[in-house]
């Protein structure tokens, strides 16, 4: 299988056939790839060809691997609408492989600068992916737990306590209103009873003042008696006559 030159460091898609099959490869380069870092382009072409052969030899169990200059992360995904495609090589019809191979390529020093500080040859590259996947799974589990906690029975205690507290607060408000109403009634009753109590208090205060001021002589008040009502003149004259000569005497004489 002879390959055409690659477009390194630019991404590309290649259709390669081996025997009666056609394979689709996507080559993608990471941010660590710089075209001027490797002057010998033939070395790059050889390493990329060897990477493709390694993927085809282990297509059922893909694992990251290392070349002289690169780290290759191979992935496999479903080839969409592959049934609508037809491939021919000369007169022979080729069968497309139903999966697409994607190669993510980084420079080798990218693994040497990992936080672990260990050399790339001693670190299985799949460990980096496994750690990333584990972190993502942990985050998903944590978010799911946060979403499920409010609806779980164990989390209903504070809500119930909050509801009970609010109900107690509302029940406490009712006696306050009743006590306020009773206080208003008592104040009104006290206001109605105030004149009698004030009169008693005034009498007691006067008695106290009289007891305390015994040395003082208070002149008695002079009450002027009102004149007797004047009767009309006719009534006074008739009364005078009736006093002298009773009418019964005149009526008695006339009857005889």
From Swiss-Prot:
GO CC annotation, single: nuclear membrane
Skewed-composition ranges (Basic and acidic residues): 175-184
Tissue distribution: Specifically expressed in germline tissues.
InterPro entries named among the record's database cross-references: MAJIN (IPR027816)
Record topology, Nuclear segments: 1-232
Region span, Disordered: 143-197, 211-235
Positions with biased composition (Polar residues): 164-173
Family to which the UniProt record says this protein belongs: Belongs to the MAJIN family.
Subunit structure: Component of the MAJIN-TERB1-TERB2 complex, composed of MAJIN, TERB1 and TERB2.
Known role: Meiosis-specific telomere-associated protein involved in meiotic telomere attachment to the nucleus inner membrane, a crucial step for homologous pairing and synapsis. Component of the MAJIN-TERB1-TERB2 complex, which promotes telomere cap exchange by mediating attachment of telomeric DNA to the inner nuclear membrane and replacement of the protective cap of telomeric chromosomes: in early meiosis, the MAJIN-TERB1-TERB2 complex associates with telomeric DNA and the shelterin/telosome complex.
UniProt name for this protein: Membrane-anchored junction protein
Organism: Mus musculus
